[in-house]
């Protein structure tokens, strides 16, 4: 066990407001933001919502639908998938999610989000990755039940549009985001992250 000065050091570290003992890579869950857009793109491609070259979606400094506006920076418009990823276009991914949640093949936004969540889970989000380090968090990928409770059953793709760009209720650990990048680099091959000794 710890004795004397070691206990003092431990106690000081535990009281430190900067939390130096918190392993943020696995214990911190944060909105992933634009790093999440590649997961969205893979989902939209697999579901046939988009293809590499079409459709192109407009971006007039953001996604605009009625009075709803999700901002974006200035770049060319309209865009297909690859330039949308390259410019991190918020509008493109909002339109993709809106199309998916409005698609009649799912029957309802509740069914669409169930399919969407299954894709996110298959890409390593919403559950622990199974690393050999203690304290790994699972993050949060909301499901229909989550939104039915939050909005009393009255929601649609526009209500939850911020999840299209990794905002809103989405939470991921830095390790989950790094794992998504590694899985893409490995051409879809998922490897459980572990510590190399």
Protein language model regions, located:
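Beta-lactam-recognizing serine transpeptidase/beta-lactamase-like catalytic domain environment
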Residues: 5-6, 10-35, 39-197
């Amino acid at each position: 066990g710890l004795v004397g000065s070691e206990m003092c050091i431990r106690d000081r570290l535990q009281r430190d407001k900067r939390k130096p003992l918190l392993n943020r890579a696995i214990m911190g869950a944060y909105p992933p933001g634009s790093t999440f857009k590649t997961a969205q793109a893979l989902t939209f491609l697999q579901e046939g919502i988009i293809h590499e070259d079409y459709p192109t979606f407009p971006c007039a400094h953001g996604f605009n639908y009625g009075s709803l506006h999700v901002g974006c920076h200035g770049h060319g418009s309209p865009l297909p998938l690859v330039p949308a990823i390259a410019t991190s276009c918020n509008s493109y991914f909002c339109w993709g999610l809106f199309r998916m949640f409005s698609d009649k093949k799912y029957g309802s936004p509740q069914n669409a989000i169930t399919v969407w969540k299954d894709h996110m889970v298959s890409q390593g989000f919403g559950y622990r990755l199974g690393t050999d380090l203690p304290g790994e968090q699972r993050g949060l990928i909301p499901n229909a039940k989550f939104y039915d409770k939050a909005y009393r059953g009255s929601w649609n793709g526009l209500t939850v549009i911020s999840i299209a760009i990794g905002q809103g209720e989405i939470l991921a650990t830095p390790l989950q985001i790094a794992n998504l990048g590694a899985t893409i680099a490995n051409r879809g091959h998922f490897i459980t992250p572990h510590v190399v000794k």
